[in-house]
């Protein structure tokens, strides 16, 4: 879909099974989602899974997006997962794999009316490569990740000039380094207290006004560890934010 000015009507859910589950189960679970008034889903893709059986991978993925759209649910596919980031994937030797994967996935889905936007990477900073580094080494590694994100966003845009692009950042504080590469910026929020959660939204509103781009929260709520559903969704409502 073309970028919207406002994503506050998005009511989404992360769907880790996604295109991998049987069609009968998929239709049943999407029906549950619609009964809860949910209208979008975010799914994790895998380049290495694609590489094993490209044709089968693309067939299942396309069928998922079409089935979800028939149920009134748009899809945000995640191309790369930062949680499982392998440092070698940031090097030149991986570029050909990334290029072929992005080309085939984007060409398969770019014409689908149910495609909400491309999420180039989930949580680029949430991995040992970044977390275990300190000081200047951490800055250097983070810039290397950002270089990969910029290249990947550029690859997507060259293949699809219509549909929106985002990056699902771990924290609001990670967003600005690549905000120029996206149409919509997105962040995750698992912070434990209202004050910290509010600060993320205030920072998002300030950045949105400054760069002229909309935003949404593409992951939130984690019972027993962080923000409970009632608190997190209430704050989204107060800040007119889609999730």
Regions found by a protein language model. Give the residues of each.
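Active-site mouth of glycoside hydrolases
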Residues: 1-182, 191-195, 210-211, 220-228, ...
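Substrate-binding surface in catalytic domains of secreted glycosidases
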Residues: 193-203
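Active-site-flanking ligand-binding surface segments in enzyme catalytic domains
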Residues: 201-219
């Amino acid at each position: 879909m073309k970028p919207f000015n406002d994503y506050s009507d998005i009511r989404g859910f992360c769907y880790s099974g996604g295109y991998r589950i049987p069609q009968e189960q998929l239709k049943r679970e999407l029906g549950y989602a619609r009964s809860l008034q949910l209208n979008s889903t975010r799914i994790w893709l895998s380049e290495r899974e694609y590489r094993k059986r490209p044709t089968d991978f693309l067939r299942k993925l396309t069928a998922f997006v079409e089935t979800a759209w028939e149920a009134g649910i748009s899809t945000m596919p995640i191309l790369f997962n930062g949680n499982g980031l392998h440092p070698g994937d940031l090097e030149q030797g991986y570029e050909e794999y990334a290029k072929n994967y992005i080309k085939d996935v984007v060409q398969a889905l770019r014409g689908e009316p149910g495609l909400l936007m491309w999420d180039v990477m989930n949580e680029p900073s949430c991995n040992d490569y970044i977390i275990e580094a300190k000081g200047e080494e951490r800055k250097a590694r983070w810039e290397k990740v950002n270089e990969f994100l910029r290249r990947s966003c550029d690859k997507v845009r060259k293949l699809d000039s219509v549909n929106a692009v985002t990056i699902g950042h771990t924290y609001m504080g990670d967003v600005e380094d690549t905000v120029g590469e996206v149409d919509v910026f997105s962040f995750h929020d698992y912070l434990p207290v209202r004050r910290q959660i509010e600060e993320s939204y205030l920072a998002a509103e300030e950045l949105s006004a400054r760069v002229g781009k909309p935003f949404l929260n593409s992951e939130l709520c984690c019972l027993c560890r962080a923000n409970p559903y009632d608190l997190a969704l209430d704050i989204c409502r107060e800040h007119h934010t889609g999730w």
